UniProtKB/Swiss-Prot annotation:
Primary location recorded for the protein, binned into one broad class: cytoplasm
Reaction it catalyzes: N-terminal L-glutamyl-[protein] + L-leucyl-tRNA(Leu) = N-terminal L-leucyl-L-glutamyl-[protein] + tRNA(Leu) + H(+); N-terminal L-aspartyl-[protein] + L-leucyl-tRNA(Leu) = N-terminal L-leucyl-L-aspartyl-[protein] + tRNA(Leu) + H(+)
Alphabetized InterPro entries for the sequence: Acyl_CoA_acyltransferase (IPR016181), Asp_Glu_LeuTrfase (IPR017138), N-end_Aminoacyl_Trfase (IPR030700), N-end_Aminoacyl_Trfase_C (IPR007472), N-end_Aminoacyl_Trfase_N (IPR007471)
NCBIfam families to which the protein is assigned, alphabetical: PRK01305.1-3, PRK01305.2-2, PRK01305.2-3
Lyase among keywords: no
Function: Functions in the N-end rule pathway of protein degradation where it conjugates Leu from its aminoacyl-tRNA to the N-termini of proteins containing an N-terminal aspartate or glutamate.
Cellular compartments annotated: Cytoplasm
Broad class of enzyme this protein falls into: transferase
Official protein name in the record: Aspartate/glutamate leucyltransferase
Biological source species: Vibrio vulnificus (strain YJ016)
Length: 232
């Protein structure tokens, strides 16, 4: 499908402290037109560097910083590294399932994750309503990849599904688990995309200076959107 977009109406937020690089200021461009809020249009907007939060579609539009680089993986061309292959071998006893709704005990897992990993973030303290407002939307198919150790839920990866691609929206997991569950969630999302014949898995923004956000370049073959051209 074409990834071209023509003129769309956007609004700019005020500058505010960056969530990922605290010493910098960020602002975002928000897509304002209601007809952009469809699965087909969002797929095009993803290819042009946009993301969503709830029903809001946005992209970074900072005055002097270009650290946020949209990144995606070409599913047919995926090349696993040695460490990723070792991780999958260690995870052979785990299972995953893509579901339309989260298991009833999801919030206990989510709470442990937020308290352990993001106590200083905007999602603390963890609240069900806040997460629903953040993750749900009214115009896109969103499913939930569950990872189990036996019968125990150890990770959930919120995944937006479109005709030709999927988007890794948000992942939470057992914070003290010995395996790299965030990486494993992406590997299982890639397995899902292979099964469903998707072309791309979008991973959001790569931020080299932010340790929590610079792991995404470890997945090959990836592309980054630089100067409005996908490279890689």
């Amino acid at each position: 499908m074409s990834s071209d977009i023509h003129q769309i109406k956007i609004g700019l937020t005020d500058n505010h402290p960056c969530s990922y690089l605290p010493e910098r200021k960020e602002r975002v461009a928000v897509a304002l037109e209601a007809d952009m809020h469809t699965a087909d249009n969002y797929e095009v907007l993803l290819a042009n560097g946009f993301r969503r939060s709830g029903n809001t579609i946005y992209k970074p539009h900072c005055d002097s910083c270009h650290s946020c680089q949209p990144i995606r993986i070409s599913v047919p061309d995926i090349e696993l590294s040695r460490s990723q292959k070792r991780l999958l071998a260690k995870a052979r006893s785990l299972s995953w399932s893509m579901k339309r709704n989260m298991d009833e005990n999801w919030f206990d897992l989510y709470s442990r994750y937020i308290v352990a990993r993001h106590r200083n973030g905007t999602m603390y303290p963890p609240k069900k309503d806040d997460f629903a407002h953040f993750s749900r939307n009214q115009w896109l198919t969103t499913q939930f990849l569950h990872i189990y150790e036996g019968q125990r839920l150890i990770a959930v990866a919120v995944t937006d599904i479109m005709d030709h691609c999927a988007s890794a929206f948000y992942t939470f997991f057992e914070p003290e688990h010995e395996l790299s569950l965030g990486t494993l969630a992406v590997l299982f999302q890639l397995e899902y995309c292979q099964e469903e014949k998707k072309q791309w898995l979008y991973l959001g923004y790569q931020i080299d200076e932010c340790p929590a956000m610079n792991y995404k370049v470890r997945f090959h073959r990836h592309q980054k959107l630089v100067n409005q051209r996908w490279q890689g």
